[in-house]
Curated annotation (Swiss-Prot):
This is CDP-diacylglycerol--serine O-phosphatidyltransferase. Its EC number is 2.7.8.8. Belongs to the CDP-alcohol phosphatidyltransferase class-I family. One of its GO terms (molecular function) is CDP-diacylglycerol-serine O-phosphatidyltransferase activity.
Length: 201
């Protein structure tokens, strides 16, 4: 018998915190909880590697949690805060692109990322939604971000450590209502991949 109780690990509990914060972001209409989900998403892999608990089960759970926290939740926040037919359509497109991106990631064994990672896509969307009070602009951005996620653009998996530390601080600021720095760093990351792709690197 397949017993979840016997195979679940400490890193899986961290992943479940990602799911919980993603769900709460929807229920409470909270942008800040998306940033907290990103922190948990970063920590679960780190904990799994440090504790030697990397598993197929954990990978599947992580993928499901990402759909909730970085696909469904940002899409809901877009529509709920900018109610319009265009926001509805773009929210659906964003969520579908995120799911497709995760499905592709699950079957590829490559160094780095193909397409913008969905946590980065979620950060971009919620950051723009917080700072730009326009359903039209945010709806268009949601579609563009979705297309970036399913593109063939390559992105580095682990930027240098200094970037990671700065990004961690920026996420903490975003959680307390200052998303500007996290959005700027993520935008640089997204543009970096586009420039390298155009140059053929």
């Amino acid at each position: 018998m397949f017993s979840i109780r016997k195979i679940i690990t400490i890193s899986d509990y961290v992943t479940m915190l990602n799911i919980i914060t993603g769900l709460l972001a929807i229920l409470l209409n909270s942008f800040s909880l998306i940033y907290l989900s990103i922190i948990f998403d970063s920590l679960d892999g780190y904990v799994a590697r440090k504790t030697g608990t990397v598993s197929d089960f954990g990978a599947e759970l992580d993928s499901i949690s990402d759909v909730v926290s970085f696909g469904v939740a940002p899409a809901y926040l877009l529509y709920n805060n900018f109610e319009s037919n265009l926001a509805l359509i773009s929210a659906i497109i964003f969520c579908l692109c995120g799911a497709l991106r995760l499905a592709r990631f699950g079957i590829l064994n490559v160094k780095g990322f193909i397409g913008l990672p969905i946590p980065a896509g979620a950060l971009l969307l919620v950051g723009f939604c917080q700072l730009i009070n326009s359903y039209l602009i945010n709806s268009i951005l949601a579609i563009l971000i979705g297309l970036l996620m399913i593109s063939d653009i390559k992105y580095p998996k682990y930027p240098n450590k200094i970037f990671i530390y700065i990004f961690a601080v920026s996420l903490c600021l975003a959680i307390v209502g200052i998303p500007h720095f996290a959005l700027m760093l993520c935008l640089i990351y997204a543009i970096y991949g586009i420039i390298k792709y155009i140059r053929g690197d």
